[in-house]
Amino acid sequence: MIEILIGIYILENIYMLYKQYKRPLGIFSPVYIVAFMSLGQMLPQLTTIYFLPQIYDRSIMYNLLFTMITCNWAFYLGSKKEYTSLPYKVLDIREKYIIVLIVLFAPCSYLFDKIVSAGHAGIETGADGVIAFQFQALGYISLILSLVYLRNHKLTPLLSGCLLLSTYPILHYAFGIYGSRLSTFIVALLYAYLFTIKYPQKYNIIRKVFTIFFTIGCIGSLSISEVRTNMGDETSGGIGNINYIENMKNAFSGGSYNYLAGMDLGNAALGIDHCYKENEFNWGLFVWNGFVFNYVPKRLVGQDVKDGLIVPFKSDKYIQYLTNGITCTTGYYDAFSSFAWLGFFVFYALARLFAWLKSRGKYSTFYMMMYFFMLSNVAVAITHGLQLVFAKVEFLILLFTILFFLLYRKKIMLKNL
């Protein structure tokens, strides 16, 4: 039975991938990314669980596979149903301020790079990781705003400079400091969109190149530990001396399993089983707890106040034990720990949000910026946790609550169609 469920999961994601690939601009769909990550990142971990029954009892795979299959399918159905009604008004950024935001936020990528580089070198900066990544987020917003703005405007020297200023630090972090798969993916995704809007007649070539890049990235990601170890180490031959194909084979057979660190989907399987046996669910409050962790500053309110705002659950300690600050629990655990077998509603709701933003993004720079800001993180929503996407929504809400005077309600006229 387990083998049949694994087969269903594989076929489901192949179908989703094929359907999105054939759709116009389908590579910029969250379903395309989720299906790709499911096959390229989750499937090797799933087969590892299957081939290591001495670590992961086969019985825990039923709830895990049910959750994986239903969540992905719910996400597909939620994205498939488009909003067809024309909105009367949409929230948008006043056009005269778009360039201001692009120029203002572009240097934030550089600040992020300097903070992280200093930390990597062991230099004390006084800024923690959460603060550093908020600077990175602002740099991403500058990059995304530039691309969305270029839908209807020409590329100018100022925009070119902002694109370079916001992009280079991201690539430096990806290839020079940490070996970040997400940063590499985001740059590839956003620049694929840039080339698409500027050269729409070349979209067939762009989607093929992007798909090949994504495939190579998934293969390389299965060797991420060696990549990060060998990066910049000339004595080991660098990343070119890694046997990627052999590592890929080991990833599917359980041969690359780290007995000390564990793995993300394995944590999800054990965490789901724990919630099931303890009959304890958080009813979606993981989103609130994540908000408190990310955006309630302990330096202002104190650690005790911050801890008091978090809604505690018994499973939290078990998850901390499993992850040990090294690995994650995946978005599938977030779904099941919220509503048990009905956890797929979380994925469906997220897909509907994407569909809603996309429908309004046709008429609004603000909504399209939000769409791509979330889309750029949907890959890690599957592999790491859904909070990483919800946090982007929270960040934009907080940011534009402060910058509310830049927004206005734009009436949709026939000329906008």
Describe the residue ranges of each PLM region.
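N-terminal "leader" segments that precede or initiate the main folded domain
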Residues: 1-86, 161-171, 187-221, 393-403
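Membrane-embedded catalytic interface detector for glycan/lipid assembly enzymes
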Residues: 75-203, 212-232, 314, 415-416
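Small-residue-enriched transmembrane helix-hairpin modules in multi-pass membrane proteins
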Residues: 218-347
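Hydrophobic alpha-helical segments
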Residues: 143, 176, 324-417
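Membrane-interfacial loop-to-transmembrane alpha-helix junctions, especially the N-terminal start
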Residues: 22-37, 91-100, 154-164, 358-371, ...
